[in-house]
Design a protein with these regions (language model features):
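Residue position within the beta-strands of beta-propeller blades
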Residues: 60-61, 138-140, 205-206, 281, ...
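Fungal secretory targeting signals
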Residues: 1-17
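Beta-strand-rich domains and repeat architectures in extracellular enzymes and scaffolds
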Residues: 31-79, 126-127
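Beta-propeller blade signature
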Residues: 76-87, 154-169, 216-224, 392-411
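Surface-exposed loop and turn segments in beta-propeller and other repeat-based domains
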Residues: 26-27, 34-39, 88-120, 170-180, ...
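Short loop/turn segments immediately following beta-strands, especially the blade-tip
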Residues: 85-90, 166-167, 220-227, 233-235, ...
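Beta-rich, blade/repeat-based domains predominating
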Residues: 43-54, 117-136, 144, 177-206, ...
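Blade-level signature of beta-propeller repeat domains, shared across WD40, Kelch, NHL, RCC1
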Residues: 366-418
Length: 418
């Protein structure tokens, strides 16, 4: 009898044992939200921006300031603005000629070399945006890298806002607005007639310069007058010792010939609210989102800077991000690269949420909402480039880069401020 009990006990003990493995452990699914739809693959030049016209035409820019391989020199065939003409090919836009400044994008007759000061050629375009009237605008920094990776200073004529197919289509920035070390990064447009005396609308531009003079530039599109606000304010500057991680790797700044540093990009992502009454922005070197009433930025009176600095709202942390975009729901979309994700801020309740998550997402650079109800965005591995620390070599980018799209929630579409 005792033996029978012992055998029974042993059997119960054996049946109570569980397999020792990870199969029953909860794990990160890696994906969330609507699936990504592949739109375009880039096999040649390094892209940042994406813009979608009302008819579905796609445009991108290739800034020579972020990759010396995109700097135009005579005979190399490079361009800084292109139309995506098939799933895998691009063509210079609006022409190869305007993308080919005589002698190249760098003026080697100055010391040190500087950006070519051509007002009628693209030098180093950082952004292309389609406005509410379906017009394309190109934001040119006037800055590019030399073959050894040195970022040259801009000269007058280089930094500009160019409206394609407009009667007066180029707005030059004075050197008191676009400094030689400025980096004009992104732009948004409000074309409502009541926002400026000229009745032609206004543009808001971020200056994300890593050299430090960050701020917001405002442009009257009718008169061409421009001015700055919030210069050096903490809201447009990177956080001290800001460090983010991508796919397990710390993103220290990789400064050639110098010790590793921190991400020093200032105000970059920018978006208007759906009613045009607020402007949102965020530094790449920060997780904090800020906004200001646009009326405070359009004011250029004697006390306007004092009033502007007192009107800023801090909306808290929204993750590591670059570009922004808006939809008719009022949501402000942004990357959340540490989560392989796209998030959105809801001004109506002050919360930030994840909308899409996928292992294919690394650095979400630029967004564009289409009138077709989709959110388009570039994924370009910027964080794997030579500008960031890497323990696996100076450049870990692997072609191709990509444009994806996802449907906007709740029948969202492009906001037309006009």
């Amino acid at each position: 009898m005792a033996r029978i009990l012992a055998v029974a006990a042993f059997g119960l003990l054996c049946s109570a044992q569980r397999p020792f493995s990870t199969s029953e452990l909860i794990r990160d699914p890696g994906v969330y939200g609507p699936p990504l739809e592949l739109v375009h693959l880039y096999y040649d030049s390094f892209p940042t921006g994406i813009a979608v016209s009302a008819s579905g035409r796609l445009f991108s820019n290739y800034p020579g300031a972020l990759d010396q391989n995109d700097t135009y020199a005579p005979g190399n065939g490079r361009y800084t603005i292109a139309e995506l003409v098939s799933n895998t090919t691009e063509s210079p836009y609006p022409s190869a000629a305007i993308n080919s400044p005589p002698g190249g994008a760098i003026n080697y007759t100055t010391y040190p070399p500087s950006g070519a000061g051509y007002s009628n050629y693209f030098i180093g375009s950082q952004s292309i945006v389609i406005d509410a009237l379906d017009r394309a605008w190109v934001l040119d920094t006037g800055r590019v890298q030399t073959p050894n990776g040195t970022l040259v200073y801009a000269t007058y004529g280089g930094p500009k806002l160019v409206g394609i197919n407009l009667t007066n289509n180029t707005i030059l920035f004075p050197t008191t607005v676009a400094f030689p070390d400025s980096y004009l990064n992104d732009v948004r447009f409000d074309l409502r007639k009541n926002v400026t005396a000229s009745g032609k609308g206004v543009a808001y531009i971020t200056d994300s310069s890593v050299e430090g003079r960050n701020g917001i530039i405002i442009v009257d599109l009718g008169t061409g007058e421009s001015w700055r606000h919030l210069d050096g304010h903490p809201s447009v500057r990177p956080e001290q010792q800001y460090l983010s991680f991508q796919w397990g790797v710390p993103l220290y700044a990789n400064n050639a010939g110098k010790p590793f540093g921190y991400n020093s990009f200032g105000a970059d992502g920018i978006s208007l609210s759906a009613d045009g009454e607020s402007l949102f922005w965020k530094a790449v070197g920060s997780r904090y989102l800020f906004s200001i009433p646009t009326a405070r930025l359009r004011d250029n009176s004697a006390t306007s800077e004092v009033m502007a600095q007192g009107a800023i709202t801090n909306h808290g942390q929204t993750g590591q991000s670059d570009g922004f975009e808006l939809d008719s729901n009022g949501y402000i979309y942004h990357g959340n690269m540490e989560q392989n994700a796209i998030g959105f801020f809801n001004p109506a309740n002050g919360t930030d949420q994840i909308y899409v998550r996928d292992p294919l997402i690394n650095w979400v650079d630029t967004f564009s909402t289409g009138t077709d109800g989709y959110l388009y965005f570039t994924v370009n591995q910027l964080d794997f480039g030579p500008g960031f620390y890497s323990n696996a070599g100076p450049d870990r980018r692997v072609k191709p880069w990509a444009v994806f799209r996802v449907p906007l929630p709740y029948n969202g579409t492009k906001v037309l401020l006009c």
